[in-house]
């Protein structure tokens, strides 16, 4: 049941909103495709490094550590060392 206050599809504001929504969705889809391509490239680099004899787990750890703030990383390393000492691991 339509009401007199219903918005018509051919009104300029409705067309603008539809076009804008379509543009947003298409941008998101394009970025998702780019993200997948980048993810595939990263996986290929790790595979290449493994083929060259590097430890992928260590490389991932280094990449993650380099993203951290130096002070936060130092604090985390200190805590880890403290726990390891308490457990007799070092």
UniProtKB/Swiss-Prot annotation:
Query: So what family is this one in?
Result: Belongs to the UPF0335 family.
- InterPro entries given in the database record: GapR-like, GapR-like_DNA-bd
Q: What NCBIfam families is this protein classified in?
A: PRK13694.1 (NF010247)
Q: This chain belongs to which protein, by name?
A: UPF0335 protein bsl7135
- Source domain of life is Bacteria
The family database entries (Pfam families) matched by this protein are listed as: GapR_DNA-bd (PF10073)
Molecular function GO labels: DNA binding
């Amino acid at each position: 049941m339509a009401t007199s206050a219903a918005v018509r599809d051919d009104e300029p504001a409705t067309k603008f909103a539809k076009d804008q929504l379509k543009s947003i969705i298409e941008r998101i889809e394009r970025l998702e495709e780019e993200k997948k391509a980048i993810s595939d490239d990263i996986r290929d680099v790790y595979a290449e490094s493994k083929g060259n004899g590097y430890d992928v787990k260590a490389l991932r750890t280094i990449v993650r550590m380099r993203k951290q703030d130096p002070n936060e990383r130092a604090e985390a390393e200190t805590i880890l060392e403290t726990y390891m000492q308490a457990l007799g691991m070092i």
